[in-house]
């Protein structure tokens, strides 16, 4: 729905995986690992260049990504509007002035926190409408903690067959995905069900947990400026 005929053609022919043989799936997986090795090699080149030019002790380096890949989890490949750990839980490594060595942060954080973190370490002032929070206090204060991190994804029918307004909250023990229009969702106890196989969303005994997580989702200001056509225009 929507978009040009060309964009619809691209969506139909190139954005969905056609049925694959086991051998083809193995090759896809091998290609993914190959791309990881390529990234690792070239990040190493960047770090070596910083060292060569004497900038490594005065540069904040953050290595992360926008999302993961299902890689067969839940019978899925690539990415999609299913917020399982393989897609959302990505690496985040930091090195630079003031960043403690061997520090591990177990609190849930978000890529929304990166911009405030850059500003904090650079001595700049954070904008008042930024939703993220600097990660510096989590790195430098051993008593600091974060209760939850948020994620959202809005899709038009052309991407998933139906319009979806998805909101996600991740704590250290639970995850809730809520679809705003229908009120449906998925909720997992990550401590006891790390592979997210047992949806607790409609379990009466879990209602209090679901309500608490829903309140966390609704605590985020709904003030995002329109950034263009949502994902799935084709």
Language-model-detected regions and their locations in the chain:
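C-terminal cap/loop subdomain of S1 sulfatases and analogous C-terminal strand-loop tails that border
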Residues: 67-73, 100, 112-115, 120-186, ...
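Active-site-proximal cap/lid insertion segments
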Residues: 1-58, 62-108, 121-129, 181, ...
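Non-transmembrane alpha-helical segments in soluble domains
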Residues: 33-36, 40-47, 51, 115-119, ...
């Amino acid at each position: 729905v929507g978009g040009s005929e060309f964009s619809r053609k691209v969506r139909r022919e190139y954005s969905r995986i056609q049925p694959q043989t086991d051998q083809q799936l193995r090759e896809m997986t091998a290609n993914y690992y190959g791309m990881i090795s390529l990234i690792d090699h070239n990040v190493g080149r960047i770090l070596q260049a910083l060292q060569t030019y004497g900038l490594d002790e005065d540069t904040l380096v953050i290595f992360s990504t926008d999302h993961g890949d299902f890689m067969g989890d839940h019978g899925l490949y690539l990415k999609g509007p299913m917020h399982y750990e393989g897609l959302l839980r990505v690496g985040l490594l930091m090195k630079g002035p003031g960043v403690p060595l061997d520090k591990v942060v177990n609190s849930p954080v978000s890529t929304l926190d990166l911009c405030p973190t850059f500003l904090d370490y650079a001595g700049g002032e954070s904008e008042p409408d930024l939703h993220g929070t600097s990660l510096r206090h989590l790195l430098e204060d051993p008593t600091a903690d974060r209760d939850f991190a948020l994620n959202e994804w809005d899709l038009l029918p052309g991407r998933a067959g139906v319009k979806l307004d998805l909101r996600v909250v991740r704590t250290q023990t639970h995850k809730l995905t809520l679809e705003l229009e229908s009120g449906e969702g998925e909720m997992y106890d990550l401590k006891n069900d790390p592979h997210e196989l047992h949806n607790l969303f409609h379990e009466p005994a879990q209602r209090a947990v679901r309500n608490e997580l829903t309140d966390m989702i609704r605590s985020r200001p709904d003030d995002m400026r329109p950034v263009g056509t949502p994902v799935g225009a084709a």
